Structure formats: structure tokens, C-alpha cells
Amino acid sequence: MRSVDRPDAGARPGVQLVLATWVSVICFWAWNLVGPLSTQYAIQMSLSANQQALMVATPILVGALGRIVTGLMTDRFGGRTMFIGVSLASIVPVLVVGYAAQIGSYPMMVVAGFFLGVAGTVFAIGIPFANNWFAPERRGFATGLFGMGMAGTAASAFFTPRFAKSFGLFTTHAIVAVALAATALLCAAVLRNGPRFLPNTASVLPKLKAAAKLRVTWQMSILYALVFGGFVAFCNYLPIYTKTIYDFSQVGAGERTAAFALAAVLARLLGGILADHIVPKYVVLAALAGVAAQTLIAVFRPPADLWTGLTFIPLAVALGIGTGGVFAWVSRRAPAGSIGSVTGIVAAIGGLGGYFPPLVMGATYDPVHNNYTVALVLLVATAVLLFGYTAIFLPAREPSPLPSSPRSAR
């Protein structure tokens, strides 16, 4: 039995990267199906703010923790097998979420949303996959382009409410399920592992322990928890935020969330490119400063629409540049045979960074004054602390990439 797909040096790197990015778009769309319709569900199911926040946050949790497993499995089986597997595994949860929405069952929605998180693990596959196709000096661009798969979040925010209005809740989810199946077939036909891919057949636990012992793993995890976690949290909670603070319709909130997500996605590519030409530390520092400044402005609830746009779009750009810069940093510093393992941990912590903010926002919302001041101030403080940590403790000159241990390179 063949457990690993052989690398194919004849395939074109650009085609492989674009297809991998497409897989990410569809999986991110599936992963973010709940958020854009959350205000409708809150009315339909008579949910409290905390119940609504839990419903939105649950897929994020599994999408975060599952990245550790998919990262490890990608080191062993390669990106092709894992992309196909995650696409297929996401189909049933998507359909069950649609059915739960159709019948108005909150318990079923939360349980199905838990398994929907599988779609969010796709990110831990794409980073090592891209690294296996591109030389180190091009990996910032490659990981940045793959990161544009986060556009699936924008697509979900923009199209999901419209599809639900035109076709109904279950049919909307069925459309995404069909897209996942078609994507899996396309991967089977076209996608190949890169020529640098060597299966890491070491036992899972030693690989995970080895990655966890690397200082770079935790340095990058802390940073990614803020920038990617902030992106995920805002993209999932912004429909609720804009409806609550500005009383936008579900479609209007979706349009603004889509603009936020798209700005972050485009900025992620910019962050990766900048990190290829500038020391990544400075890219990340600029991003953290932008996050702190723009979130502080948001505390004062600028009026819609011009001033909110001038607040949240630059915030999205800062988060996007930060995500691109951090992962370009990871791809340069992680050991070659453990990139998937390190990526899995970093991506998991980043996802967890997106899990807690919706819960915090739901718990700290002030209905008397109609604001989320406490949650936003906490984000400002965290960004400032990480700016200081990065500026003082992380060196501007990067150490050379660490060699893989003999055991992990087997």
C-alpha cells in the first residue's frame, strides 16, 4: 500500500500554489459559515449574547487545535493527501450545520459547528506544502499567496447571507458541500507534492515534543495568536458587532465584514513579500503598532460609514501584514523536516487566539452604553505588550535555519 504520494518535480510550482490557495478559499468559506448568519440565528433561536458568541466560536476551537494534527500528518503524508482528506471530511459537518439551521436547533448547531472546525485545519497543510515547492528566498511570497486563501472568509461574509436569502439555509450549505467535493476531485487530478518533500516517518509524539522544544515555535505562536487570532475573531464576530453597534442589516453587516476580510487577505500577501525584502521583525512590529492604534480608535465608536471604514480597514491591513510577516519568519527559522509540526503548533495557537475574543466580547458587552470597550481595550493592551516583547527580546538578525535532527529527517 502506498501511504505517501511521491513528489513530482515536473509539475509547475505556480499552478500547484494557486490550486492549494483555492482549496484554502473553499475550506475557509466552509469554516466560516456560521458567523455571517449568526444574527439571523440569534433571532430565530432566541439566543443570548453568550450563546451567540459560543455558537460562533466553536468551529474556531476545533479549527485551531486540529491544526496540530494536520501539520504532523502533512509532514508524513504530504500536502496532496491532506488537502483531499480535509476537503472530504468537511462535507458532512457543512450539511449538518445547514440542517440544524433549517430546523432551528441550537444544540445541533453547536455540535455540528464543532466538527465544522475540521475545515479550518487546512492552513497547517498549505504552509509546508508551499515550502516544498519554493526556495527559501521565495517562501515569503509563497506563504503569503497561500494565505490569500483566507479570502474564503470574505466570500462567506459576502455571499452566504445572499445565498441564504435567495436559496434558503440548507441549499446554501449544500452549495458549499458540492464545492468541497469538486475541490477534492480537482486535487486528486492535478495536485502533487513538491520536489523538496521528504516524508517524516518519526512517531507523532516525538515530533510534537521536538517542535514544542524549539524556542521559535513559541515566539511565533504568541505573535500569531494576536494577528491571526484577531483576524479570525473579527471576521466571525464583526457581523454581530456591526449589527449591535450600528444596527446594520444582516446583508449590510456581511458586506462590511467581507471588505474587512478582503483587506486582510490582500495585506497578508503584502506582509509575506515585505518579509522577503525586509527583516521580518520590522514587518511584524509595524503590524502590531497598527493593530494597537486602530483598535484604540475603534474604542471611541467612530460614526458609520466613512469613519468606521477608516478605522477597521487599516486594522484589517495591519492584521494581514502581521500574519504574512509571522509565517514568513516561521518558514525561515523552522527546521526543514519539522516545518509542518512547527506550523501546526503556531497555526493552532493562532486559531486559539481567535476562539476566545468572541467569548470575551459576548461576556463584556455593555448593553447600557451599547459598547464593547472592555474587549477592545484588552486587544490594545495585548498588542502593546507584544510590540515591546518583539522589540526587546526577538533579534532583528535572524539565526540560520536549524538543521533537522537525524531522527526527524528519516
Show where each model-derived region lies:
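Extracytoplasmic gate region of multi-pass secondary transporters
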Residues: V34-S38, V216-L269
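Conserved MFS/SLC helix-loop-helix module at the cytosolic interface between two early adjacent transmembrane helices
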Residues: L65-I103
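Helix-to-loop junctions at the C-terminal end of transmembrane segments
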Residues: G66-G78, A267-V279, Y365
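Cytoplasmic membrane-interface "Motif A"-like loop-to-helix N-cap segments
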Residues: R76-S87, D276-L288
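Cytoplasmic helix-loop-helix junction between adjacent transmembrane helices
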Residues: A112-G149
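Helix-loop-helix hairpin linking two adjacent transmembrane segments in secondary transporters
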Residues: L145-L191
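C-terminal transmembrane helical hairpin of 12-TM major facilitator-type secondary transporters
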Residues: I278-V326
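A late C-terminal transmembrane helix in Major Facilitator Superfamily
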Residues: R333-H369
